[in-house]
């Protein structure tokens, strides 16, 4: 819906996205003490969640909120992004050993129940709040809907539905102190079950989200976390050259499904676009080669969910419909579109065209469930190619890149090039480089590129018109 707004300016789409994110971020579906979003709400107010927290939900929300923040600069979204990433780095990290220098990845989920009761870990009563917060309890209770009878089965789910807008810096600091005190007490409760499996596909989603958020908000720790999780999957979840689906306590299980390759390849491409490190692009190309060999349907096009070598499936399914996570075929459409632009290899475009032909449908009710695929169609046809030429350590190069990162261009494909690095011969910016010895940025749509931009402010203005 946000992409639809960015493409055609539909204000109703924009309003729907902003309203939904605002209500979710104020409601009880959000963990106001620990950060992170629960799996879903059971009511129309986003008040009462199913208290289970999933890695994939939070990864997808971080990515979406980052993209929306690029345009709106919403303080609420920036706060929720930071809090959610802080939660993931505090509570979801899985390491292979006790060595703090080892790469880490992310666990799958926290259960909803503790001590046999759903939500018990998360809810409060008024007496607890009064006892713990003392003189500051009245202010806290007025912000978080706390009253004697509770708002859920006699208990209180903390929420800011009545006060969704952030207050002054001083007001928020006072509330933060109170939340921190409550969080310390909550941490001593019996925790919900932690599902510490590392799933390649879900980690791919989080790597992509952390990479984007880390560069947009200039948070090196987030980007390093993305690199760590990527390294974990590449080194600990690959057996005999092939990716596996799960890792737990040193044990690999299950041959990778399409979603594993699709999401990890997208993660590699995202890391390449945001760091300029070609080793990520090389790995993306290698993974797509494996995916084409093991999952591509040579007869009809598109990708099967399971590998050709899989022996434990009755039939090989193929779907483009998004569920709680993006469809593997939808993600691969975006992967192919990006790799075609980044490398100039026409095989990627040919496969994307075959998928377009296979999955295109005039039935609008079918297309509603294929939004990731539709985004891939748009990217293939109307990508905004941004090329920044300059030495990576040059402050002027960094300023141009930061402008790109903080500007909302959902269809962008970014290439960071040193002055002597070549572009594919068919790339519209082929042969372009520094201007008067200074770093420069080029914006290309189709076969046409804009005049070079050396000034970050001018680049931001040019990007706003794409």
Residue ranges with predicted function:
Residues 1-466:
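Glycan-recognition and catalytic cores of secretory/periplasmic carbohydrate-active enzymes
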């Amino acid at each position: 819906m946000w992409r639809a707004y960015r493409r055609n300016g539909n204000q109703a789409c924009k309003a729907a996205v902003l309203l939904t994110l605002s209500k979710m971020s104020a409601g009880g579906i959000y963990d106001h003490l620990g950060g992170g979003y629960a799996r879903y709400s059971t009511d129309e107010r986003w008040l009462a969640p199913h208290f289970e927290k999933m890695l994939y939900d939070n990864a997808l929300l971080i990515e979406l909120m980052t993209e929306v923040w690029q345009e709106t600069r919403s303080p609420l979204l920036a706060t929720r992004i930071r809090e959610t990433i802080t939660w993931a780095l505090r509570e979801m990290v899985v390491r292979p050993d006790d060595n703090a220098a080892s790469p880490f990845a992310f666990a799958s989920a926290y259960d909803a129940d503790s001590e046999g009761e759903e939500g018990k870990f998360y809810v409060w009563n008024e007496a607890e709040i009064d006892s713990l917060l003392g003189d500051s309890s009245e202010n806290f209770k007025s912000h978080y809907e706390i009253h004697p009878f509770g708002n859920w089965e006699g208990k209180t789910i903390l929420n800011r539905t009545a006060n969704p807008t952030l207050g002054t810096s001083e007001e928020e600091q006072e509330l933060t102190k109170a939340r921190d005190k409550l969080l310390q007490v909550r941490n001593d409760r019996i925790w919900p079950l932690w599902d510490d499996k590392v799933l390649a596909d879900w980690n791919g989603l989080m790597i992509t989200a952390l990479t984007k958020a880390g560069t947009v908000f200039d948070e090196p720790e987030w980007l390093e976390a993305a690199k760590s999780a990527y390294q974990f999957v590449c080194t600990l979840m690959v057996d005999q050259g092939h990716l596996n689906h799960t890792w737990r306590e040193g044990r690999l299980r299950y041959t990778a499904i399409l979603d594993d390759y699709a999401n990890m390849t997208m993660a590699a491409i995202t890391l390449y676009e945001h760091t300029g490190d070609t080793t990520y692009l090389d790995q993306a190309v290698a993974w797509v080669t494996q995916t084409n060999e093991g999952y591509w349907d040579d007869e009809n096009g598109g990708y099967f969910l399971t590998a050709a070598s899989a022996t434990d499936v009755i039939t090989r399914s193929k779907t483009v419909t998004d569920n709680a996570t993006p469809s593997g075929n939808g993600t691969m459409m975006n992967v192919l579109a990006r790799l075609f632009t980044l490398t100039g290899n026409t095989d990627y475009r040919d496969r994307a065209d075959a998928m377009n032909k296979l999955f295109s449908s005039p039935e609008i009710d079918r297309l509603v469930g294929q939004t990731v695929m539709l985004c891939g169609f748009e990217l293939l046809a109307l990508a905004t190619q941004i090329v920044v030429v300059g030495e990576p350590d040059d402050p002027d190069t960094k300023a141009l890149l930061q402008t790109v990162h903080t500007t909302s261009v959902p269809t962008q494909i970014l290439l960071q090039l040193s002055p002597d690095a070549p572009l594919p011969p068919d790339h519209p910016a082929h042969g372009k480089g520094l201007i008067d010895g200074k770093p420069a940025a080029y914006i290309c749509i189709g076969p046409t590129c804009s005049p070079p931009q050396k000034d970050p402010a001018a680049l931001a203005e040019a990007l706003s018109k794409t």
